[in-house]
């Protein structure tokens, strides 16, 4: 087993414990508590996969964190500022669009829309989002454009359900791509989106989705709309 995998799990367990102590003092807000619950489920799953006891891992994680803090200066403890990256122009972000055969799905706190009437087109996904630690922090808006510039799909956060992770965005992108490719469209991810939010792509920015997976995703959209 990779040592980095183990130590990462140990640190995550300890940091979750610190956040839990914070929540026990009734200091956490609703999004904080929601993330705490989701992360608890994730840690249990990772612990089962790795065959590691969470309590033991938490103690080991505490030692790692304490060792790091002893070596850190106050300057190093400052939180890096997030960066706002733009694929789309203001006009592309604000433009109204309509769908001939509308399909919509809510995945967590993200809303996925696409026009199932679009066939045999070359499509590119572009997005505006913030980045921290070289990873997507917050998605502002993602849209799918044809070569002619028409908008044929979109992923946007739901105002009523704030908070999403880069994995949430990846999953939503998979669903959008699967739905569009069901109609024999060719979907490509922009370079900036590929770099920070979609790292499992090939050189053309096309995600490695086998045909059976694409069909499964498209059927999922059909059944849930």
UniProtKB/Swiss-Prot annotation:
Gene Ontology MF term list: protein serine/threonine kinase inhibitor activity; RNA binding
Region (RNA-binding and homodimerization): 1-73
The keyword Ubl conjugation belongs to this UniProt entry's keyword annotation: yes
Chain ranges for the short sequence motif Nuclear export signal as given in the UniProt record: 132-141
Region annotation Disordered: where it falls in the sequence: 201-225
Gene Ontology biological process: symbiont-mediated suppression of host cytoplasmic pattern recognition receptor signaling pathway via inhibition of RIG-I activity; symbiont-mediated suppression of host gene expression; symbiont-mediated suppression of host mRNA processing; symbiont-mediated suppression of host PKR/eIFalpha signaling; symbiont-mediated suppression of host type I interferon-mediated signaling pathway
Annotated signal peptide: none
SUPFAM superfamilies per record: Ns1 effector domain-like, S15/NS1 RNA-binding domain
Motif (Nuclear localization signal) on chain: 34-38
Segments for region (CPSF4-binding): 175-210
Keyword tags: Eukaryotic host gene expression shutoff by virus, Host cytoplasm, Host gene expression shutoff by virus, Host mRNA suppression by virus, Host nucleus, Host-virus interaction, Inhibition of host innate immune response by virus, Inhibition of host interferon signaling pathway by virus, Inhibition of host PKR by virus, Inhibition of host pre-mRNA processing by virus, Inhibition of host RIG-I by virus, Inhibition of host RLR pathway by virus, Interferon antiviral system evasion, RNA-binding, Ubl conjugation, Viral immunoevasion
UniProt cross-references to Pfam families, sorted A to Z: Flu_NS1 (PF00600)
Gene Ontology, cellular component aspect: host cell cytoplasm; host cell nucleus
Modifications the protein undergoes after translation, according to the UniProt entry: Upon interferon induction, ISGylated via host HERC5; this results in the impairment of NS1 interaction with RNA targets due to its inability to form homodimers and to interact with host EIF2AK2/PKR.
Cellular compartment(s): Host nucleus; Host cytoplasm
Region (PABPN1-binding): 218-225
InterPro entries per record: NS1, NS1A, NS1A_effect_dom-like_sf, uS15_NS1_RNA-bd_sf
Subunit details: Homodimer. Interacts with host TRIM25 (via coiled coil); this interaction specifically inhibits TRIM25 multimerization and TRIM25-mediated RIGI CARD ubiquitination. Interacts with human EIF2AK2/PKR, CPSF4, IVNS1ABP and PABPN1.
Its job: Inhibits post-transcriptional processing of cellular pre-mRNA, by binding and inhibiting two cellular proteins that are required for the 3'-end processing of cellular pre-mRNAs: the 30 kDa cleavage and polyadenylation specificity factor/CPSF4 and the poly(A)-binding protein 2/PABPN1. In turn, unprocessed 3' end pre-mRNAs accumulate in the host nucleus and are no longer exported to the cytoplasm. Cellular protein synthesis is thereby shut off very early after virus infection.
Family: Belongs to the influenza A viruses NS1 family.
Entry domain remark: The dsRNA-binding region is required for suppression of RNA silencing.
Name recorded for this polypeptide: Non-structural protein 1
Gene, per the UniProt record: NS
């Amino acid at each position: 087993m990779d040592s980095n995998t183990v130590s990462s799990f140990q640190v995550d367990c300890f940091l979750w414990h610190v956040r839990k102590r914070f929540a026990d003092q009734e200091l956490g807000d609703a999004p904080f508590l929601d993330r705490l619950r989701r992360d608890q489920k994730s840690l249990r799953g990772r612990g089962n996969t790795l065959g590691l006891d969470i309590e033991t891992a938490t103690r080991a994680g505490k030692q790692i964190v304490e060792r790091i803090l002893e070596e850190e200066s106050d300057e190093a403890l400052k939180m890096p500022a997030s960066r706002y990256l733009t694929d789309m122009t203001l006009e592309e972000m604000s433009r109204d669009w309509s769908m001939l055969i509308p399909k919509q799905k809510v995945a967590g706190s993200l809303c996925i829309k696409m026009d199932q009437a679009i066939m045999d087109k070359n499509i590119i996904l572009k997005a505006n989002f913030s980045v921290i630690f070289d990873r997507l922090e917050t998605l502002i808006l993602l849209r799918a454009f044809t070569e002619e510039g028409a908008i044929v799909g979109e992923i946007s956060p739901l105002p009523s359900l704030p908070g999403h992770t880069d994995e949430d965005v990846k999953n939503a992108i998979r669903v959008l791509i699967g739905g569009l490719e069901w109609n024999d469209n060719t979907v490509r991810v922009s370079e900036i989106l590929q770099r920070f939010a979609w790292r499992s792509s090939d050189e053309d920015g096309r995600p490695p989705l086998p045909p059976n997976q694409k069909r499964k995703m498209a059927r999922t959209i059909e059944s849930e709309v």
